[in-house]
């Protein structure tokens, strides 16, 4: 009986601990040999409503979203130097977003200033939910290209 009540208590605790409306999602990060790559995805509606100043800045650097664009993909390229995090901006970044339902979209991401350093970003069409494959193509000045893949579940 005690085992059953403990199990029930744990399940209820987990159910109430879940947050359905997390505003800022934790970015996903991949560690490469030379640097780290982090992505974050936020819907355009959330940006307009909660962060109008940030939306205006993104609109200035990325242009106005097209008719079917629903989300903003942000990419940060960074590395740790001692205790400091240094954001790297001397790259060109392209993103390819694929889903089982929508056709693949590949776009060059625009550089824009962020609170801690330069980020890269662009507008994309994503559905309300689903699993997305996001491929990033990062090129440096010498022509070397890194491909980084993220599987992203939009809920």
Report the location of each language-model feature.
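Short, solvent-exposed, Trp/other aromatic-anchored flexible loops in extracytoplasmic proteins
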Residues: 105-137
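Sec-dependent signal peptide recognition
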Residues: 1-8
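Short flexible loop/turn segments that cap and initiate beta-strands
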Residues: 84-98, 102-106
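Short acidic/polar inter-strand loop motif in beta-rich domains
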Residues: 140-147
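Beta-strand-rich domain onsets/edges
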Residues: 18-72, 78
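Hydrophobic h-region of N-terminal signal peptides that target proteins for export
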Residues: 9-17
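Short beta-strand edge segments in extracellular beta-sheet folds
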Residues: 151-155
């Amino acid at each position: 009986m005690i085992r059953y009540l403990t199990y029930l208590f744990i399940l209820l605790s987990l159910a109430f601990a879940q947050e359905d409306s997390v505003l800022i999602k934790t970015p996903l990060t991949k560690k490469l040999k030379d640097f780290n790559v982090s992505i974050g995805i936020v819907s355009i509606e959330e940006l307009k409503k909660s962060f109008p100043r940030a939306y205006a800045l993104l609109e200035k650097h990325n242009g106005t979203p097209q008719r079917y664009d629903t989300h903003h993909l942000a990419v940060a390229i960074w590395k740790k130097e001692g205790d400091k995090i240094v954001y790297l901006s001397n790259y060109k970044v392209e993103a390819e977003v694929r889903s089982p339902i929508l056709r693949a979209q590949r776009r060059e991401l625009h550089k824009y200033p962020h609170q801690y350093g330069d980020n890269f970003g662009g507008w994309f069409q994503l559905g309300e939910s689903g699993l997305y494959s996001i491929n990033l193509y990062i090129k440096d000045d010498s022509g070397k290209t890194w491909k980084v893949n993220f599987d992203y579940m939009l809920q």
